[in-house]
Amino acid sequence: MTISQHRFRSNANASIISMLQRFSDILIIFLGIYFSCFINDYFFNLHYVLMALVALVVFQMIGGITDFYRSWRGVEFSVELILILKNWSLSFLLTLGFVTLFSDFDLTFRTFIFWYLAVCAGFVVTRPLIRALAGFFRRIGYNKRRVAFAGSLPAGISLLETFRKQPWLGFEVKGIYEDSFSGTYDLELYAGKISDLINEARKGTIDRIYIAMHMRDEVAIKNMVSQLTDTTCSVLYIPDVFTFNILQSRTEEINGVPVVPLFDSPLNGINMVFKRLEDIIVSSLILILISPILLVIATAVKTTSKGPVIFRQVRYGMDGKPIKVWKFRSMTVMENDDKVIQATKNDIRVTKVGKFLRSTSLDELPQFFNVLFGQMSVVGPRPHAVSHNEQYRSLIQGYMLRHKVKPGITGLAQINGWRGETDTLEKMEKRIEYDLLYIRGWSIWLDLKIIFLTVFKGFINKSAY
């Protein structure tokens, strides 16, 4: 097979996979509404076809914005599935709003929910099947990419090992090329010098080259890239940014200029919309459910000690902006935010009712109003006293990065036991470690998991005084 034939076959198969994805998505959306009408005894007519068309147009538009129909080769299935479910959820909500405002369709809410869930189920079933089909063709030689690595940065070695351990991805690793063996990987992976790599690329025996070299090797990188312009290889650069404790590993393009965020919030674009919807829905439902409890607690606080029912504390919110956080008053003496003394075991300032509220986290229930008003999130790093921020930002590297998202009522640190008094630097460091881990790995599913586990792990804690 000639070089051109190989490249044509690879690209053709990639296009076929993309077409399969689009066709299956169209089919699922239409079959979903048909199934929903059938289950709920509605006659399927042109009106519902038009509704499905609206949903499909919106879904395709959002897919274009989120670049959903790109190649998912090498990306975990969970990432692909989460994005398609996000796209469909937003498309469904927009379609529902459009239908409610501009039409008189008589579909019940139950029918709409059936449609939404049926399409979700369809995506969950078909996406793995398409992946499995693509993996099968790659195993037998179709849609494969012959890849090589220039340099041996740890990030490059990690990517290489992923390709070797997961052959269904369709990457055939030729080896690592560098002018001298660095000794950071198995000798069998060493394929030659950079000049050998360039020669192989010119012969057409390599489809893709990953440059995994230090930024200090700028001259060598430029020289190599210049010579690779005389080939038809795809050349990709693995940024040497993983030496930083980065929050987000993604790339952006601004007016044609590629940028790599080092410290940025994961809540951009559609993620921000979904996070806010999550907060509004969850906080509203919880406030409705706990309204009798709020009334009982407010009465107990008011009748057992002098002072207001609600205690408002100044805390740092998203981007370090001050917010006022609501809590049920649990002390006889108010804290001064300029000089905060943390509550300790047997603290005489804590009332009898307050002791129970603090040990069960019930004193924090009014913060769901903060969530509803947009100052906080249900899930996020817990807000610290202003004086603590000023103290620990100089002691713990990356402390202020926790303010790249809204503070939360519960968080990853809390369900892992890092809640209550932080009387040592080590305890605070551990809490910050979990806060940053949450920001790096944020997803709607992680939020839901934390909310679920909070019910069992996050409320009762002996270290909360």
UniProtKB/Swiss-Prot annotation:
Reaction catalysed by this enzyme: di-trans,octa-cis-undecaprenyl phosphate + UDP-alpha-D-glucose = alpha-D-glucosyl di-trans,octa-cis-undecaprenyl diphosphate + UMP
Q: In which pathway does it act?
A: Capsule biogenesis; capsule polysaccharide biosynthesis
Q: What is its EC number?
A: 2.7.8.31
Which residue spans traverse the membrane?
23-43, 46-66, 82-102, 105-125, 280-300
Subcellular location, record wording: Cell inner membrane
Q: Enzyme class, one word?
A: transferase
One GO cellular component this record assigns the protein to is: plasma membrane
Q: Among the record's GO biological process terms, what is one?
A: lipopolysaccharide biosynthetic process
Q: What is its main location?
A: membrane
Q: Which UniProt keywords apply?
A: Capsule biogenesis/degradation, Cell inner membrane, Cell membrane, Exopolysaccharide synthesis, Glycosyltransferase, Lipopolysaccharide biosynthesis, Membrane, Transferase, Transmembrane, Transmembrane helix
GO MF terms here are:
glycosyltransferase activity; undecaprenyl-phosphate glucose phosphotransferase activity
**Which InterPro entries does the entry mention?**
Bact_transf (IPR003362), EPS_sugar_tfrase (IPR017475), Undecaprenyl-P_gluc_Ptfrase (IPR017473)
What membrane topology does the UniProt entry give?
Multi-pass membrane protein
Source species, domain of life: Bacteria
Q: Note whether Cell membrane occurs among the keywords.
A: yes
Write out the function statement from the record: Is likely the initiating enzyme for the K2 capsular polysaccharide synthesis. Catalyzes the transfer of the glucose-1-phosphate moiety from UDP-Glc onto the carrier lipid undecaprenyl phosphate (C55-P), forming a phosphoanhydride bond yielding to glucosyl-pyrophosphoryl-undecaprenol (Glc-PP-C55).
Classification via NCBIfam families: EPS_sugtrans, PRK10124.1, WcaJ_sugtrans
User: What family does the entry list?
Assistant: Belongs to the bacterial sugar transferase family.
The record's listing under PANTHER family reads: COLANIC BIOSYNTHESIS UDP-GLUCOSE LIPID CARRIER TRANSFERASE, UDP-GLUCOSE:UNDECAPRENYL-PHOSPHATE GLUCOSE-1-PHOSPHATE TRANSFERASE
What is the official name of this protein in its record? UDP-glucose:undecaprenyl-phosphate glucose-1-phosphate transferase
